[in-house]
C-alpha cells in the first residue's frame, strides 16, 4: 500500500495530461493566454528546433508542451525556454539534487508528457505565488527567490525567452 499515493498521483497527472491534449486539440485552443494572444505559425515548434531539441522528439515535445500550456495556461514559449535550461529536453536528465526528467522535478514519470505537465503546474503555482512576476516565479522554480544561483538561472531563462520572442517578432507584444 506504500505506493498507492504515488500511483494515484501518476494516474491523476496522466488523466490531466490526456484532458489537456484533448483541450489543446479542440477548436477553442487558448494556449498563450498569460502573456500574449495566439499567433498563426507554430512558434513552439520553431523554438524547439532553434534550441536544438532532439529532432526525433520535436513533434512530441511540441504536443506535450502545448497540452501542458492548455491545462495550466502558462505560455508555451516560456515552458520551452524553461525546459531547455533545465534538461536540454532530455528525459533521462538527472540533477545533482536528484531531480529528474525534462522539467527536473521531484516527481518523475516514465511519460515525458507527465513530466512536462508537472513542470508547467509547478511554474503556474510559482507564478501565482509571485503574483505574476516571471522573474520571481522562475527563481522560485530554480531553487528559491532569495538564492543568488536561482536568480542567475531565472535571468538566463528570461533572456532566452526574450531572444526567442524577438526572433519571431513577438517581443513588442509584451
Regions found by a protein language model. Give the residues of each.
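N-terminal Sec-pathway targeting helices
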Residues: 1-14
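Residue-level detector of intrinsically disordered, flexible termini
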Residues: 6-7, 23, 67
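Catalytic-site microenvironment of enzymes
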Residues: 10-12, 19, 152
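Small-residue packing motifs within transmembrane alpha-helices
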Residues: 15-16, 65
Amino acid at each position: 500500500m506504500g505506493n498507492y499515493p504515488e500511483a494515484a498521483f501518476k494516474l491523476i497527472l496522466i488523466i490531466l495530461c490526456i484532458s489537456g491534449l484533448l483541450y489543446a486539440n479542440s477548436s477553442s485552443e487558448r494556449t498563450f493566454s498569460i502573456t500574449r494572444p495566439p499567433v498563426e505559425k507554430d512558434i513552439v515548434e520553431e523554438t524547439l528546433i532553434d534550441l536544438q531539441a532532439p529532432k526525433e522528439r520535436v513533434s512530441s515535445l511540441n504536443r506535450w508542451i502545448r497540452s501542458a500550456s492548455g491545462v495550466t495556461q502558462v505560455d508555451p514559449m516560456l515552458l520551452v525556454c524553461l525546459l531547455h535550461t533545465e534538461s536540454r529536453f532530455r528525459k533521462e536528465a538527472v540533477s545533482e539534487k536528484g531531480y529528474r526528467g525534462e522539467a527536473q522535478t521531484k516527481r518523475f514519470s516514465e511519460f515525458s508528457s507527465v513530466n512536462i505537465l508537472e513542470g508547467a503546474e509547478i511554474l503556474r503555482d510559482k507564478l501565482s505565488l509571485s503574483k505574476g512576476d516571471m522573474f520571481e516565479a522562475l527563481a522560485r522554480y530554480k531553487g528559491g527567490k532569495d538564492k543568488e544561483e536561482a536568480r542567475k538561472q531565472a535571468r538566463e531563462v528570461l533572456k532566452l525567452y526574450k531572444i526567442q520572442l524577438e526572433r519571431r517578432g513577438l517581443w513588442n507584444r509584451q
